[in-house]
Amino acid sequence: MNNIRNFAIIAHIDHGKSTLADRLIEECNGLETREMTNQVLDSMDIERERGITIKAQTVRLNYTANNGNKYCLNLMDTPGHVDFSYEVSRSLAACEGSLLVVDSSQGVEAQTLANVYKAIDNNHEIIVVLNKVDLPAADPERIKLQIEEVIGIDATESILISAKTGLGIKDVLEAIVTKLPAPQGDTNAPLQAILVDSWYDPYLGVVILVRVKNGVLKKGMRIVMMSNNATYQVDNIGIFTPKKVMTGELSAGEVGFITASMKEVADCKVGDTITEEKRPCSKALPGFKEVHPVVFCSIFPNNTDDFKYLREALEKLHLNDASFTFDAETSNALGYGFRCGFLGMLHLEVIQERLEREFDLDLTATAPSVIYKVETQNGKVLNIHNPSDMPDPTKIEIVEEPWITATIMVPDQYLGEILSLCEERRGEQQDLSYVGNTTTALLKYKLPLSEVVFDFYDRLKSISKGYASLDWEISDYQESQIDKLSFLVNGEPVDALACIVHKSRAEKRGREICARLKDLIPRQQYKIAIQAAVGGKIIARETINPYRKDVTAKLYGGDVTRRMKLLEKQKKGKKRLHSVGNINIPQNAFIEALKIND
């Protein structure tokens, strides 16, 4: 056990951690040269294309150090994006040390901070690695100072590397072996293992990634999940090198995978403790919590025949990702679809993109919303995330909405605009400080989640030319003035356009969407009224004027009454059309109408 090292790589998005993982695998001959691809551990196409890691991955490397000893290194590659922060915290709980990778031209960013603090909470030994030192803009000395001032860890012995060219990779491996502690654990104690991740394999069923803390996990053993007391028999045990290699057992300190004839990923909660049925351990490992979706939106197939394929696709994605939820729902305007819950906007985009690409579905998604707590006058508390479930305004006592604490790091030349963006989004400033003696400001803000889920991140990036970084966590619920904004086209409510907004925004948002619909809905032979309403009160209206056919064109001279008769007939016809005519709102009108204007 003294020769095992378990470590995670933590970094902000794009600071090069997946590339560093590639180099470490190469250096330890984990894969043959012909099998090496860029970002080996990012197995999904979207992960490679967007250059982000979504699922936590693991690999075991065998390394012979300069002192001649053979070491077994378990590397956990963690996601860097804020939506997947729970995956990061679980991966960190399974390790004793971390490599903190910082881009030596960009320096420390908000998510680096958040993840480092998680590592420190897990009592990790941290090795600082400065990447991209081959770039002309690299300034390692400045970044070392910044790390010491912002994070408060010693960066004098930072390792300078370039993951792209392979410079300094050997030094990283030596540092892992010499500076990081070996895992603690007792192989004779009852089995105690933490469930780090799980995914669905078409041949093996559910595969669980585990880190054994105490005891030994053997093939054929009956195990118990401590969160729900479900029992299973272990069928296979193995490790990733990154290829699967069956080993038959895992003992204290080791990281590997097991399969146990589980049908669904939802059965194995990430962060749960696994123990033996015959000889269970006395208590579960700390840090387990259920992950709940934060952002909701409805997804409808553009072709109604695709409904069953959409259900199958969602079930397949759910096999791999239990943090995302879905329930069937119907809409008068869009037909049958699903109400889905996600961890954040990136999570939503990734799932939607996977549905469209991997399953070839053509989809419409409604405006994302968050969970509001509504207390009715008879004392009931409802959790509402779908505008159509919102009770009548006369029956509502109070509405509470979720607030978050956001940490934003931004160069000071963009500070003014970022502050006004936060104020515009109903933010409350908590703290503003400067990072050491640099020109980077560290902002702490409390913001309503509903103002952040839409396009806050994109606006933040565009205002700051990409230099600002954001990390957030949900803090609490606060009472708020919330209204349901409904839209009527020709007096008929269109449920797919309804949204829940803050009272101060209702009129502006209503006018915007009505104006947009006016441009998007095709003209008809009769007049169309588009209205926005809150409660029973109309707050905005636009009118689409009708086409007018010139029915008098063929008249030449003659009596004026003939002309009047034809015009009268046209008027009657339009009236009849107006009462029976059904307006087909094109699909793209929904999507375009719900986009928020800057």
UniProtKB/Swiss-Prot annotation:
Gene Ontology CC annotation, any one: plasma membrane
Chain sites annotated for binding GTP: 14-19, 131-134
Record keywords: Cell membrane, GTP-binding, Hydrolase, Membrane, Nucleotide-binding, Protein biosynthesis
Domain tr-type G: 2-184
CDD domains attached to this UniProt entry: EF4_II, EF4_III, LepA, lepA_C
Gene3D superfamilies attached to this UniProt entry: 3.30.70.240, Elongation factor 4, C-terminal domain, Elongation Factor G (Translational Gtpase), domain 3, P-loop containing nucleotide triphosphate hydrolases, Translation factors
Enzyme class: hydrolase
Superkingdom of source: Bacteria
Catalytically driven reaction(s): GTP + H2O = GDP + phosphate + H(+)
Keyword Ribosomal protein: no
Swiss-Prot/TrEMBL GO biological process terms: positive regulation of translation
Enzyme Commission number: 3.6.5.n1
Cross-referenced Pfam families: EFG_C, EFG_III, GTP_EFTU, GTP_EFTU_D2, LepA_C
Described function: Required for accurate and efficient protein synthesis under certain stress conditions. May act as a fidelity factor of the translation reaction, by catalyzing a one-codon backward translocation of tRNAs on improperly translocated ribosomes. Back-translocation proceeds from a post-translocation (POST) complex to a pre-translocation (PRE) complex, thus giving elongation factor G a second chance to translocate the tRNAs correctly. Binds to ribosomes in a GTP-dependent manner.
Annotated family: Belongs to the TRAFAC class translation factor GTPase superfamily. Classic translation factor GTPase family. LepA subfamily.
Xref: NCBIfam families: lepA (TIGR01393), small_GTP (TIGR00231)
Family matches, as HAMAP family: LepA
Name under which the protein is recorded: Elongation factor 4
Gene: lepA
